[in-house]
Amino acid sequence: DFTKRMGVIRFRKRDDRESDGQVKGGWGPPVALLYRSGPSSAMHIGKSVEQLADWLVSFDPSYLLAYPSIMNPLMDAVAARGGRPPSLEEVRLISEPVDPELQSRLATEWQVRCTDLYSANEVGYIAFRCREQGALHVQSESLLVEVLDDAGQPCAPGATGRVVVTSLHNLATPLLRYEIGDYAEVGAPCACG
């Protein structure tokens, strides 16, 4: 629901950090091009856990976008302030692997959905976790993802290789077969289709 509050904890450019914690009138581009959205607020990941917890409790978003590595300390700090953000419905985790224990903790202690998004600064969202099977689905509408072995050949299902991406929508600086430094295991086709 784009009309609800969105909170973001992630790396922010130095110029953007001056607005840490300020409430803005929408979620920003590209959402603003398609939908009218509710208020948003962002904090730089470099803030102290105490500052992030105070902001989260005060802003009380419905959705939180953050890195997995900050969530356990953040949950501990919020618990020390009396529990959980009451309006929070979903935590969207980006850029790092998500530990199953963290997913379980979010579901148990905060009673929220946890969405795992595989992403990279260079290309944005790469894949979303399937709610039916748990595998990651590549966002093939916006990029081509290859998992290549040491010889530069596509890996077979079950094999691990280097992640190479080609952005299909970046008109300013096209990334062609860009190796992002990650490794992934190729899965079998998902039963969801």
Predicted features, each with a name:
Residues 34-193:
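Active-site glycine/GP-rich loop and adjacent strand/helix microenvironment
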Residues 1-33, 39-43:
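Conserved AMP-binding loop of ANL adenylate-forming enzymes
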